[in-house]
Amino acid sequence: MKTIDANTIINREKLSPLQWMVFILGFFVFFCDGLDTGIIGFIAPALLDDWGITKPQLAPVLSAALVGMSIGAIISGPLSDKFGRKGVIVFTSLLFSIFTILCGFANSTQDLMIYRFITGVGLGAAMPNISTIVSEYMPVKRKAFLTGLAGCGFMLGISCGGVLSAYLLESYGWAKVIIIGGSIPLILVVALLLKLPESTQYLITRHQQDKAQRILEDIQGHSFQEPVKLVLTQAENASDENPVKVVLGKYLWGSSMLWLCCFTSLLVFYLLTSWMPTILKTAGFSTQQFSLIAAIFPFGGVIGATIMGWYMDKLNPTTVIKYSYLIAFALFIVAGLVSSNIFLLGLTIFLIGALLAGAQSSLLPLAAMFYPAVCRAVGVSWMHGIGRIGAILGAFFGSLIFTFNLSLSGIFFILALPTFISFIALSLKVIYEKSKNKQVLKLEESL
């Protein structure tokens, strides 16, 4: 019986139709996740007017989904590593689709808060798991680029929510806009059931050789000529280890820095996506102006994540992302200085999106590359879940902005600080990894 490393087939230069299918499905899961995540922020000004509620009264509604996302991400990782990626992705995609539609029929802030919480559980569970499975199917030389490119669907989804709101909100109302946003993922769920394969790395670690073999034969385009035993590299094949113990053991320092980075990054990201339309409206911008400027932010993230993914495959991926946060920090200062000029503000918001939102999108493929298969879903999901706690705080801090009557310039100056902390966290991760590598080299030289 011939022994074959499954990754040698996946890592071929040319992607197979099955790998492209995983990429496309991953992109659309990210797109729908972004659409249903961001759409509540775009309809928030209309919701305030329609229901006659105050901004602090709306804050729990905006935060409910973020609480759900944190819970969904944290609990889905162990479930995915135990029961498989596909089932978790399909179920959670269906969950956030149905409850986003129900949001359009809510009659009170309490109903809307409950629906958004359950929506958030689905959104939070789907994203890290689809990122994991896309990463596992992409060849190593283009893993960061293609995984990051699929992740751009999230930013495009948020932008699409802004465009829908800009052209439909005033004519059709907030309820129809959010129902449209929830209906699109229902089509995707059918495609996921029919076309998304299970992770071959998961199947091999769970000793399901026959299923993994059929998928790998599909990727290479022909059957194996003799009986084979599929294996993974030594780092990937520690299937008997407890994934939680692996994350909290030898990967603890790197995990801690990823958690801190994701926490502060998502705090800023979700404060902007949840409250930017309302902040800009309060500053005097029209509905079309604030919707389009707010949509520019995640669209910049699409450009940024694409470029970063390419560089992450060529250079140290952590270093690429950390400098993106540093430049984003400087751009927040610039945004505060040019906030009175709509053209310069829009341009700066686009660049912040390219660097901050692009870096945030790139954290998922970075984490997927950092962890081995045995704990990859747990590691990625926990980073995402802990980061969502920052998102929750971001949504609440957004409501406090109006309490303190901060100027638009003051808001941008404040947002620069957590962005700088993200840079520091990744810098510490790089320093630790370099120190650890030097220790390994010294040990090898002494033997």
Per-region residue spans from a language model:
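Cytosolic juxtamembrane N-terminal segment immediately preceding the first transmembrane helix
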Residues: M1-L35
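Intracellular cytosolic loops and amphipathic helices of Major Facilitator Superfamily
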Residues: M1-R12, K195-Y251, N437-L447
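Extracytoplasmic
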Residues: M21-K55, L272-P277
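Extracytoplasmic gate region of multi-pass secondary transporters
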Residues: I40-G41, L248-A305
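Helix-breaking motifs and short loop linkers at transmembrane-helix boundaries and internal kinks
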Residues: G52, G84, F105-D111, G122, ...
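Conserved MFS/SLC helix-loop-helix module at the cytosolic interface between two early adjacent transmembrane helices
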Residues: I71-T109
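Glycine-rich segments within core transmembrane alpha-helices of 12-TM secondary carriers
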Residues: R142-E170, I184-P185, H384-G394
